[in-house]
Amino acid sequence: MARNLCTPCQRPTSACICSFIIETHNKTPLLVLQHPSEVKQSKGTVALLNGSLTSCKILVGEDFTHNVELNEILASHQVLLLYPGEHSQILSLHDKKNEGKFTQTDKAKPLLLLVLDGTWKKSYRMFMLSKNLHSLTQVCLPDYLANNGQYLIRKVAKKNALSSLEATCYALALLEGEIKITTADKSLKTVEPDNIDCGNYQPMLNNFIKFNHFQLSFRG
């Protein structure tokens, strides 16, 4: 017997995620390159990103070297690849110069954030295969954010690793000057999640926590 599906999210009605989607205007457009294995992953977070952000596009594949649509986007935007590579620049807290810093090379092109969605191994493979990504400006999150993941429902490569939604919200909040930190530790070596406020993106992160608990409820 066919299961009843929720029309908007295309999931069984018992697993509908629509209540965790909240419309959020992002000044910086988001492009997600998603590994094919993530498309039907019920615990994935890109569906929440795509449903919530007003400017979000998803391309599915593994080797994007000759992807015409992606190459057109790369040619028309100043692209920041969120990827913790050897040459990545760390996005700064309370630095409203972030956007200016990364748009100096070509002010005529709008800024765009690009995120790879997949396990660490699959994201690495996507990056290595996609030669057109290698020349992009790479950015990464500061450690106090990168190590503050609340992704409880999937096995991750390291403790407190971030989901695609968390990483994206943190990056957008940093780029757009939305993050506020309340802690006595000025070094920011350790910051508790409750001390991080991502402004415009905080409701999405709050709903992400609820999404985690919702998924955990199916484990009985």
Predicted regions and their residues:
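Cys/His-rich short segments
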Residues: 1-27
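Short microdomains enriched in Cys/His and/or Lys/Arg
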Residues: 19-47
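C-terminal folded domains that constitute the principal catalytic or ligand-binding module
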Residues: 112, 121-220
